[in-house]
Curated annotation (Swiss-Prot):
Gene Ontology BP, a term: chitin-based cuticle development
Name of protein: Pro-resilin
Protein species of origin: Drosophila melanogaster (Fruit fly)
Biotechnology usage: Its strong elasticity suggests that it may be used for industrial and pharmaceutical applications. Recombinant protein can be cast into a rubber-like biomaterial by rapid photochemical cross-linking. The resilience (recovery after deformation) of cross-linked recombinant resilin exceeds that of unfilled synthetic polybutadiene, a high resilience rubber.
Biased composition annotated in UniProt, kind: Gly residues: 67-81, 90-99, 137-147, 156-166, 235-246, 255-264, 322-334, 411-422, 433-513, 523-563, 573-582, 596-610
Annotated signal sequence range: 1-17
Length: 620
């Protein structure tokens, strides 16, 4: 009996240990109080209190919420047609391909095709759903092929796929990385679209690659390869080379680093493409592009190192161009302006200046490598030198000839002097530097700076300021009077009438002298009547003024007194009577037989202080 009782208890425990099947496996979900916790592939969530927790196809609640993590065929994680709640929310992360997100409170978290909420949000990563027009845009949708972003609040965050035509929000933002959607016209542009049209107002695609038109107001695509840059604010940042016709901004900027564009027109006002296209005519030039013919700026710069661009007409040439199309490049195909035509020219000139006596000229004719010419010059001696030459690749071959006869003098004849008439005849003679008539014969002779000269020898027969009739060098003339003497610097005096015969004799600076010897027979300030001396000087008397009758040079006369000695600077003293203390009168030796202050015989010896004495005085 106990065995039977134990078996009964064991069976009861087995029966009690088996769980009952859930109610929602047999009954439809409640429309009033709740939703099944783990609804299956078709249950409808409650319209009042909630939604199925993870149903695979059930319709979420229109009032209280949406399925949390559905995985099936409805609207949850993998729902394909379920409609999200219009009031309280949207599926959290469903992959539905057509479900409509809530138009009031939210949007599906990651649906792949559902239409985002028109009021509160957009699917987080939908691939084609239309983003919210009011509150947001899909967060990171991937492959949406036509969804329209929100026109009010935002744009898809990080679209990564191949959207080819969706229109971005026209109010608040643009798709983050759409590849073809049209960016917002108001607030932004796609981050990296490949062809969509950027915003005309606030921005441009960040790195579009294939041709989208950038904003004409605020920006340009960051790295587009051919899109048209903004006409107002900017240009593509760093396009990589395939834009073949995009027009950069004409106001504010140019593409930053385009590397292969072959025809885009850069900005005419503010900048130029960084690497390639036609540079700006106003502000800059491409930095270091590889363009094959772009024209650099004619105002501000030249391409940095483009291998063929035509250099600037105003500021400089390309830094190191070596390409195949620009003017000046070293490659084949460009107009490099080589001098491949033979040179051909002809010129001639002749200069004649009669007042200065200049006469010269040159003529030349060239045809290819062969040159002929002639130049001529009037030489100082009156002849004309003519050089005729030929030049070619074999060298320079001159032939020299002369015309006319050379003058006899050593210099050109002049028509007159500074202030008088000259009659000389030789080089730098028969003329004077100024405006007189010169007929003299000797070098710088026969003429004078300021008067009439008739003498024949060099710097003789003339005087600076009077009439001269003498014949010797710097004789027969005086600076300021009439001279009749025949010797060099004799027969004349600077300021009076002189009748002496020898050099610097027979004349005196300021009076009448009748002596015949050098610096004798005359005195600086008195009357000299001695024979060979005939004048008074500092010797042979006393220097106090008077008449001198000495007969030797610089003796027999004194500057200011009466001297009776005979020898030069002897037999007299500068300041006393002959015969006194310090006076020598014994042997007529110049400045000898005594000294100025004592009675010795040998004094200064047989020679004078300032000249050569041979016993006959201060002769020289």
């Amino acid at each position: 009996m106990f065995k039977l009782l134990g078996l009964t208890l064991l069976m009861a425990m087995v029966v009690l240990g088996r769980p009952e099947p859930p109610v929602n496996s047999y009954l439809p979900p409640s429309d009033s109080y709740g939703a099944p916790g783990q609804s299956g592939p078709g249950g409808r969530p409650s319209d009042s209190y909630g939604a199925p927790g993870g149903g695979n196809g059930g319709r979420p609640s229109d009032s209280y919420g949406a399925p949390g993590q559905g995985q099936g065929q409805g609207q949850g994680q993998g729902g394909y047609a379920g409609k999200p709640s219009d009031t309280y929310g949207a599926p959290g992360g469903g992959n539905g391909n057509g479900g409509r997100p809530s138009s009031s409170y939210g949007a599906p978290g990651g649906g792949n095709g559902g239409r985002p909420s028109d009021t509160y949000g957009a699917p987080g990563g939908g691939n084609g759903g239309r983003p919210s027009d009011t509150y947001g845009a899909p967060g990171g949708g991937g492959n949406g092929n036509g969804g329209r972003p929100s026109s009010s609040y935002g744009a898809p965050g990080q679209g990564q796929g191949n959207g080819n035509g969706g229109r971005s929000s026209s109010s608040y933002g643009a798709p983050g990385g759409g590849n073809g959607g049209r960016p917002s016209d108001t607030y932004g542009a796609p981050g990296g679209g490949n062809g969509g049209r950027p915003s005309d107002t606030y921005g441009a695609p960040g790195g579009g690659n294939n041709g989208g038109r950038p904003s004409s107001s605020y920006g340009a695509p960051g790295g587009g390869n051919g899109g048209r840059p903004s006409d107002t604010y900017g240009a593509p940042g760093g396009g990589n080379g395939n834009g073949s016709g995009g027009r950069p901004s004409s106001s504010y900027g140019a593409p930053g680093q385009g590397q292969g564009g072959f025809g885009g027109r850069p900005s005419d006002s503010y900048g130029a493409p960084g690497q390639n296209q036609k540079p700006s005519d106003s502000y800059g030039a491409p930095g270091s592009g590889n363009g094959n013919g772009g024209r650099p700026s004619s105002s501000y710069g030249a391409p940095g190192s483009g291998p063929g661009g035509r250099p600037s007409d105003s500021y400089g040439p390309p830094a190191s161009g070596s390409g195949a199309g620009g003017a000046g490049g070293s490659g084949p195909g460009g107009a490099d302006y080589d001098n491949d035509e033979p040179a051909k020219y002809e010129f001639n000139y002749q200069v004649e200046d009669a007042p200065s006596g200049l006469s010269f000229g040159h003529s030349e004719m060239r045809d290819g490598d062969f040159t002929t010419g002639q130049y001529n010059v009037l030489l100082p001696d009156g002849r004309k030198q003519i050089v005729e030459y030929e030049a070619d690749q074999q060298g320079y071959r001159p032939q020299i000839r002369y015309e006319g006869d050379a003058n006899d003098g050593s210099g050109p004849s002049g028509p007159g002097g500074p202030g008088g008439q000259n009659l000389g005849a030789d080089g730098y003679s028969s003329g004077r530097p100024g405006n007189g008539n010169g007929n003299g014969n000797g070098g710088y002779s026969g003429g004078r700076p300021g008067g009439q000269d008739l003498g024949p020898s060099g710097y003789s027969g003339g005087r600076p300021g009077g009439q001269d009739l003498g014949a010797g060098g710097y004789s027969n003339g005086k600076p300021g009077g009439q001279d009749l003497g025949p010797g060099g610097y004799s027969g004349g005096r600077p300021g009076g009438q002189d009748l002496g015969r020898d050099g610097y004799s027979g004349g005196r600076p300021g009076g009448q002298d009748l002596g015949a010897s050098g610096y004798s027979n005359g005195r600086p300030g008195g009357n000299g009547n001695g024979g060979s001396d005939g004048g008074r000087v500092i010797i042979g008397g006393r220097v106090i003024g008077g008449q001198d009758g000495g007969d030797q040079g610089y003796s027999g006369g004194r500057p200011g007194g009466q001297d009776l000695g005979r020898d030069g600077y002897s037999s007299g003293r500068p300041g006393g009577r002959p015969g006194g203390n310090g006076q020598d009168s014994q042997d007529g030796q110049g400045y000898s037989s005594g000294r100025p202050g004592q009675g010795g015989r040998n004094g200064f010896g047989p020679g004078g202080q300032n000249g050569d004495n041979d016993g006959s005085g201060y002769r020289y």
